[in-house]
Amino acid sequence: MGIRKLKPVTPGQRHRIVGMFSEITATIPEKSLVFGKCKSGGRNAEGHRTVRHIGGGHKRRFRLIDFKRNKDGIPARVKSIEYDPNRSARIALLYYADGEKVYIVAPNGLKVNQLIVSGKEAPPEVGNSLPLADIPLGTIIHNIELRPGQGAKMVRSAGVFAQVVSREGNYVIVRMPSGETRKVLALCRASIGSVSNSEHALEKSGKAGRIRWLGHCPHVRGVAMNPVDHPMGGGEGRASGGHPRSRKGLYAKGLKTRNLKKYSSRYIIESKKK
């Protein structure tokens, strides 16, 4: 892994910082685990735009990722580490002893030909998946389930990790990457280690065109619009627009949007740090 800053041969290269891709060992994905992916362009079934700033982008093929890791006791060998255009982390192709092939989110330190395993009896080593009840306190984890058997829902982006803090009855206290501390059922699974591609946050696109390749469209400022289009629009000259608001009129800075009656609030011990 690592990053490199390109030489300023062109204006688009001047500020560009890209990943090294040194950990990638295969460029052609496993055919049985790849599917076509249709882009919506931010439109719904009726063709109406429901999400702004989405459209275009390079054509992608979807890699089927195993987030459940429920083949307990069956060892798997890491065949390759690959690039996935649909996520910031790298993915690893596993060959199970029974012949099945799956993709998983690759953690930092995972090597080709390394053996990994899932289940209660698995050792707490990088790449292994265990129930939270069997993971030692202080261990760095990722790919955390919220309900047993549901599949990993949290801590899946490049470079992030959570930490097992303590145990409380049927729950395990986990410190999330945001700084939030919350309870998770001890039967839920998590994988050992931090997610790969840690330098992803240091990358810079260098030009607007590379953002378009990713499927993002230009974001027009509200103060540049007319009053009919945005609460911050209008005014003589370059007006400030008043208090920052969203297009729907909600305060854009400092307004809490989480539902106070959300069922999962009871599991949050300490809110995330701002």
Curated annotation (Swiss-Prot):
Keyword ATP-binding: no
SMART domains: Ribosomal_L2 (SM01383), Ribosomal_L2_C (SM01382)
Biased composition (Basic residues): 244-254
Family indicated by similarity: Belongs to the universal ribosomal protein uL2 family.
Protein name: Large ribosomal subunit protein uL2
InterPro entries cross-referenced by the UniProt entry: NA-bd_OB-fold (IPR012340), Rib_uL2_dom2 (IPR014722), Ribosomal_uL2 (IPR002171), Ribosomal_uL2_bac/org-type (IPR005880), Ribosomal_uL2_C (IPR022669), Ribosomal_uL2_CS (IPR022671), Ribosomal_uL2_dom3 (IPR014726), Ribosomal_uL2_RNA-bd_dom (IPR022666)
PROSITE patterns assigned to the protein according to its UniProt record, in alphabetical order: RIBOSOMAL_L2 (PS00467)
Subunit structure: Part of the 50S ribosomal subunit. Forms a bridge to the 30S subunit in the 70S ribosome.
Residues spanning the signal sequence: none
HAMAP family attached to this UniProt entry: Ribosomal_uL2_B
Disulfide linkage: none
Keywords: Ribonucleoprotein, Ribosomal protein, RNA-binding, rRNA-binding
GO molecular function annotation: rRNA binding; structural constituent of ribosome; transferase activity
Protein task: One of the primary rRNA binding proteins. Required for association of the 30S and 50S subunits to form the 70S ribosome, for tRNA binding and peptide bond formation. It has been suggested to have peptidyltransferase activity; this is somewhat controversial. Makes several contacts with the 16S rRNA in the 70S ribosome.
Cellular component GO terms held in the UniProt record: large ribosomal subunit
